[in-house]
Amino acid sequence: MKEKKTALGNRDEKEKSRELSAAEERRLRRFEELSDSLIGQGYRRVELTVSIVKANIFAVVLLIPLLIAGIGLFFLHNHSVSGGLGRMNPILFLVLLFALIVVHELIHGLSWSLFAEHHWKDIEFGFMKQYLTPYCTCGVPLEKGAYIFGALMPLVLLGIRPMIAGILIGSFGLLLLGIIMADSAAGDIMIVWKILRYRSEAGTIVYIDHPTQAGGVIFEK
């Protein structure tokens, strides 16, 4: 067990020290300048980021209960598999999945932009080529509720709602699509869980999305 933890720890460090694009370096410099400013004002910095590797492991684990619950409820409500996405060409299904991965990040951005100071101008997108992972980041501080709202909206809109709709209308394909998209939000779930578990007696807390890693950083005083 100790060796496994060490291996995961090494992967975490490798992830944090990955090669950044020019845009990521610019965002990181801007973030560190903001961090230094807040620390200079008496704030304490607390990292609430999650590892992409651990998020991928959690996604594998999460897929099992999602499949059991989704398929179980589907056949409790329906006695057979019917149309909709259930009859879609497998290639088109994969194309739709890739398109929804992009939409997933756009939903993060649109949701956070509602609360960001300069709205859409404060939202940027990137791609971790080492992990084939697209991401969205908000460059300005957000309140806790706003941060969580933006983090969970893709899960709700692309995962939970299609799952429920698939069960209700008897479309196994739509159910499967919802399950996959809900599972793709595993990292978002980890981030929100980490935020909700964090306890602080600080009078003021600022939530800022990390510009190059999954998750956020809080500043408290």
Language-model-derived ranges and their functions:
Residues 2-78, 125-221:
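Metalloprotease/metallohydrolase-associated module, dominated by Zn2+-dependent proteases
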Residues 108-121, 198:
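Catalytic Zn2+-binding segment of zinc metalloproteases
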Residues 80-82:
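Membrane interface segments of multi-pass transport proteins and intramembrane proteases
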